[in-house]
Amino acid sequence: SLKEEVILDIVKGRSPQIENTGDTIVFSVTGKPIVPRSENQLKLVQEYEKNDMLFAIGPAGSGKTYTAIALAVRSLKNKEIKKIILSRPAVEAGEKLGFLPGDMKDKIDPYLQPLYDALQDMIPAAKLKEYMELNVIQIAPLAFMRGRTLNDAVVILDEAQNTTTQQIKMFLTRMGMNTKMIVTGDMTQIDLPSSQTSGLIQALKILKGVKGISFIELNKKDIVRHKLVTRIVEAYEKFEEKQKTLHSCHSERSEKSENIKRIY
């Protein structure tokens, strides 16, 4: 049951005050504790306490982005930082966004809506609007990060599998004093042209073993959406594995055919 102070905060449109309640990260706007719902989500929370840069890699619905945003909101409410900065690469718009109608907010909203959704679960609407007007919470496409130094912040890069190698290096080197960075991505949902290397894949290879950087891998066991999501992920994994096998067999047959032609 909710404490009287928590109920009062909700009625007055304030975020409930955070207490150290075991695994609770923050309270939702309805007063419900937001907690890690799987072993790997808990690991993400624990690694956040020990490292300034985290990479959380896993399938859709595994809670990587939601948990990351909850950690950022907790740090802001506990006055450990001064701002939260959320970003994702707008692949569909080539990171330029110039062809879309409307002002900047109208242009970026479609790509960043999932981040708004998570924030709205954790911060009352009026307070969230105030935070955004004061730039305490900033949500912007990755291209808008160039040239900035990000101090006193938790910075989250979502959908990082769709960054180029240059973009992710640019992002990671924006890190300033008293700042934590969380990079999330799903290796099965790369939307880049096949000729381009995912910046996330390259970064994972280059940064492995660097002190102060933690890597958390989530999987289908961590999926906390509708149970069908897990089945859908499994079905696609089987399909993709089958496609790889068929492609491999086709390549072998083509190679044998070429060798026979050379003989004759």
Where are these regions (language model features)?
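Interdomain "pre-motor" coupling segment immediately N-terminal to P-loop NTPase/helicase cores
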Residues: 1-21
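Conserved adenine-nucleotide phosphate-binding loops and their immediately adjacent elements
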Residues: 21-33
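Conserved helicase motor core of SF1/SF2 NTP-dependent helicases
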Residues: 31-39, 47-157, 161-249, 264
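Short acidic, low-complexity intrinsically disordered linear motifs used
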Residues: 250-254
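A cross-taxon signal for low-complexity, glycine/charged-rich
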Residues: 255-262
